């Protein structure tokens, strides 16, 4: 009798463990929001608050936020930050409100542009809701061109943002507590699955205080678009409704991609954001190239970065973005751009060539596999690795580091401006971990062309 009970108990325990293991290894959904649950409905309290640089980040910035539709043309209040809780009499800026209807209901997205600020000054600001206000946030305007600058660069976040992007953002903030600017290389969300607003809610939740502590400059990815008239002769890419209202970006882009291209100056750096999806799928590559030529040609600063979602040199098998190389690459080489920051391919790879330095990185959970070509032409490369990048500019030296989700150094180099000799790349190998490769034959969904999803 006792033996029978013992066998039954052991079998029951094994069954329970097996059930737990089976549950633990199921593919994780893109969001943590269960079906039928409304997690990110708009309210009278301001949320999704994000600051972005003005064209001249020394004298201004812009803020976007969301409320329910009871709030229209709310205020942003701003003062020079001080140590007293008495904020004094603030300057008030009236926002422009735009209606957006989603699976979470109707919302008003607001934009306030703040100009006329003093360089290298810490400002406190807050945004208005329905009979309430946000917390006071701090933003320091850009300093003189000779001042040091630390910034962050993230590859695609896209999937499972709260679950797995959160830890990378936290690690990045720990490693770069003095960062003032954050660049995102597109595909911030996945989209196209009927819960776009949930995904944007998760993106903001995953980024926690970063969007109100730094100024944020994103590039649009293909997942910020959707397919209209899919599987018909009229099929075309259309920019998703969230993008134009979620961020308050400079309005200086090319006419053919006005909402998705822009440039700005931050100290001794000019950043130009191009739209790879529009260039490749909507035929704007030539127009973007002419605009890029002007934006880079008028750059008075020592440093320049071009950011785009799709890579010029793809590290993933089966991808080849010919139109980017045909129209835009000659402009980048003509103006001796220092860095080209990219995403899209869900691996890490740095092209083995003199400047411009072409980098592809990934922050989120989706992980692809490297092509044989990438293994030959790029170094270092990585699969199955979540990363963030820290860039530090000080005088004639740009210091670049790529770190893993746990903070380990993966890639590092310096670009040194030697005046008449141009910019020289200096490898920094000390402290780097070994290259990482995917050891799984397939994903939990059975896809052999990916490492994780």
Predicted regions and their residues:
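Conserved, compact domain cores that house catalytic/ligand-binding motifs in diverse enzymes
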Residues: 149-219, 224-225
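Acidic, histidine-bearing metal-coordination/catalytic regions of metal-dependent phosphoesterases
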Residues: 19-153, 174-177, 384, 390-453
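Short acidic, glycine-rich surface-loop motifs adjacent to enzyme active sites
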Residues: 185, 189, 299-316
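Active-site-proximal beta-strand elements of phosphoester/diester hydrolases
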Residues: 148-158, 268-278, 305-309, 356-363, ...
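Acidic/histidine-rich helix-loop elements
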Residues: 82-109, 152-167, 190-192, 234-237, ...
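Bacterial N-terminal signal peptides
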Residues: 4-14
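Extended active-site neighborhood of metal-dependent phosphoesterases/phosphodiesterases
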Residues: 111-113, 122-138, 198-300, 319, ...
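Active-site metal-binding loops of divalent metal-dependent hydrolases
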Residues: 129, 154-159, 186-188, 222-223, ...
